[in-house]
């Protein structure tokens, strides 16, 4: 299938109706279409242009996810539900100011309050993106698989980085989160293998499960003194990590949080009371060669604590 023109008799396009029709290069939607279902055109990577007729009132989640070839998105004037204001090359829900679908040439207007889940999912051609300060939330999988994205700065209003929001963005090299972020969701930056520098603000209280799993480019990691919990597998398979500093604020570390960080040679824990460890937190770490440095008066406590006591070389430092 390379071309698709829908007749005026078609009013709705069902779930996954044309999903993964990667050979589709031209699409003409008639002015009779009122709804486009979930994943209707997902993975139609050959599409370069999309014009949404003014008749469309409903678009399902991930309707255009993975349309990596899209260069231009236009919503016809007169559409009561959606627009592509300011030539933004995106589809925006007028009522909520939510951007629900974008492409590699999208420019996000200052009026957008939310980037919806899956809005840019699989948009591998996206290389630059400026998020305006109007954006307060970013949905799940919003930028998953945007492998061409190299830099990311989140606006100061974003409080939560939701699950898988930037997973598999392997081109990202540096990540700085604003002081507004309090929680990093599960798999949020999973397999962002290009990240070499990670700066987390003092506002972050929890790091979700597998949040930075497979970030193999990370070599050093210092967590801020606000983090209380580290989720299961949060930094698992960060095989390039050599030094780790855990703050005094950490109370619990989930199962396998640092599993298979095989190059770890130095861990500094600033907590006087050893954080509670889940199952095999440091599995795959050479506990004979990796040095564990803890507060001077806490060496005995660490030698007794579960998982910490598996390290052969525990020594104290003076504050």
Residue spans for each PLM region:
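Consensus positions within tandem repeat domains that build extended binding/scaffold surfaces
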Residues: 14-17, 37-42, 60-63, 116-121, ...
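Generic short alpha-helical hydrophobic face used as a protein-protein interaction/packing hotspot
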Residues: 95, 119, 306-308
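Short, aromatic/basic amphipathic alpha-helical patches
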Residues: 280-283, 300-311
